[in-house]
Amino acid sequence: MVFQSPTTLENTIRTIFPEIWLRTLAIKTCFIKRERKIKPEVIFWVLTLGFCVHNQRTIAGLKRLYEIEANISISDSSWYDRFTPELVEFLHQCVIHGIEELAKEPGRKLSKKLENFKDVIIQDSTIVRLHSSLAAKFPAARSRTVAAGLKVGVMVSAVANGPKTIALYSEKSAEIKTLRIGLWICSGFTSYI
């Protein structure tokens, strides 16, 4: 199957989902029992890249797109019969594979000064004011009246550009008590002698 002028997004998706992997997965999930007119890699591309932001697709529209991309003509029943629990499982496994592949590669690279570190973790806390009826459970730190406050503690990975942990505390909780250091941090430090 040949797409004209593939974009960067298509190239990225093609490296994450090679055609041979898609065919193997289709057989493994019983989406394809024997390959005839419905090709698993073509249906994958049509279902994933066949939608546009401002364009509403129908199943019939996807069928026409499939026929164009596969350069074949198929009957309506042959097309509609493919929308089965096996297709759902096939697409589900594709999503899991895609998430695993994206998690393998960090989104950012650290600068020269920080290249010896595996990751940089940033601790951030935000105070959210709550209704005064919650003051017993979430007392505020500095207040002359009865007030309630919630501290949202977030540890963010600079490399993955996403949260490592998220926790809720009373506003009175000290910052040092919100920092949870566990075994996950051991691989993040490198000692120099």
For each predicted feature, which ranges?
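Conserved, well-structured functional cores that handle cations and Mg-NTP chemistry
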Residues: 1-193
